[in-house]
């Protein structure tokens, strides 16, 4: 490897004598755009959109462009130097160097600024700037073989629409158009924009096709504009072409509907069966998919008017099943007579391969210093039960060891199996069938995307040698649906988790007896949960969108309500279901994000995350499962600290010396607010400056209740260090860690939420970061610096953190934080 690196380094050094040696005579090396200047520019949303399109048409990357920038470049591009040195030489090494590492020079003649100027001027005119002009000039470098390009854009007057008239359409079409004018994309006073005019023409075409005019096309209509009647404005006429085909002038109805299924595209159809008014052809003894499922996915029915929206919905629903490799809708007139108004539909479906096999490898780590590999092996089957279902089963195994050389290694294994149905399965939903109104007509149940029902069961086994073997069995039934492009829903009427230990050692039993918080965390428990999530995102056309997600969940309340009938009190502790204690709580979490576009490419984002959990009823010491508690810190929260390094409230980390007890830094109340400015630096590279504030709190003395009798626990732990007899196993307990818990207990009163101390309890950090947009993924690097911590640090004033000491963290992540 070193040999190849040395060869490449020497090759670059030899070639570094010139970056223009490969530039032919009479041409120049293009080194980027010098600047793009604008005259008569009036800032508004329309002009900003035009400006963005203008700069795209003028952009051209030089050799060594930094992150796709047209203006910033590396002064000595290695690829160009290698190409100059070896492109004209013979021999295998020279050809390998040129093809593998070289890149030919970007010449001024190839960039062709004259052509780009012409294209940019057409962009101006297509956006209504008919009097605009674009010019360019060559900016010479001190090296005559190098040059940059400077562009000048004189936008001129923006032409607008003075009036709009729809003329020349048949009576039926004209009636539909006039009724739909409130939905028109163009209005009096709007800019004369070709893109908007085209969208209106497509709207009219889709409107007519959705009302039976199957053969109507956008090209059957056109615009006429009078730009002389009113100076600087256009009087617009939208009308139908005179000589359109006769079949595009009248409505069409759906006739026969035939569906043919094939496993391979060349398979022959040997069996045909009828279901209601649907004809299904296939090969074999029975249809590969149940006819009722086929009918529920088709919105085009016999003897009904053709509807383009129903056509698109049918395509989307059939493809969304994920079981076909090809889907083809064919519409054919029943005969060739002039009076024919019936279209027969033939749907050809070719099935995809039924099975997928996958293997995944992962590296796992935890905040308590354990790390290890994980392997996942799975199998998926499409159309598992002839209803478009997807069946999946996966097995996983992992091993983790203590990085500091301790004896806390463990291994984990388990499986997960799930079935996803491409419809809602519930007694109160009635599948995806249409509902009947009181007057006997059908009321469509429309969804923006195909709704799904997920059934999942998993089992996970953790084996800690010398301590315990614990099983966690989880079952879930979840609905997902989306009625509009902006709103999504997810409802899980039951998420059941059962945790129990198969085997425990004497060593672990003594540890439980000594530490009550370990006893609670590891006790056998049942968590019967219900959860609902609503997500809203603004339409993509909004310049300053919002995103909002709220989740409400509860556990144990329905069971406790049912036990009232058997004489159990609501607040009675330690009630069991089938001899298993169950959890009881209410939990609410909401997440809100608002984005403002600042200038052309920069954004300002604010983010708010709030959470509240209330534990009561059947819970031991008013505690909930540890996985349900809130925590802060990490790459998407308070970026000045790693996860679980802040809170609750003004808890001092020096009170808790053992990092294995970091999970205690949690709360039942959570509040985080973030402010982040994301400017584009150049190309696809963006910067970030952010400010984060937040914390977690307890709504009561939760951990004090959990760690009650801690002094006795410490005494037991210290006594357990000395074996009672040679046959008694030694318990690995660190008395110093237990004393740190005593210190922690002393602070718990201040861990409770208080409006009076809210200003001081909020941990605050700032920071900077980089974001690189690869198109399909965003890479992110953040450096968070603490400004204020809610506990005493020995520093006076509000800014008491150590931003260049322990209160700083670097995060590398994929995707934006919010």
Language-model features, listed with the residues they occupy:
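Internal, charge-rich low-complexity segments
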Residues: 44-51, 58-59, 63-79, 260-269, ...
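Gram-negative/organellar outer-membrane beta-barrel architecture
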Residues: 176, 287, 307-549, 639-640, ...
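C-terminal outer-membrane beta-barrel translocator/porin domains of Gram-negative envelope proteins
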Residues: 284, 364-368, 490-684, 689-755
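Interaction-mediating elements
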Residues: 18-320, 329, 342
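Flexible glycine-/small-residue-rich
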Residues: 19, 153-157, 168, 238-242, ...
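Conserved C-terminal beta-signal and adjacent last beta-strands/turns
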Residues: 672-679, 687, 693, 762-774, ...
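Sec-dependent signal peptide recognition
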Residues: 2-8
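C-terminal motif of bacterial Sec signal peptides marking the signal peptidase cleavage site
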Residues: 13-16
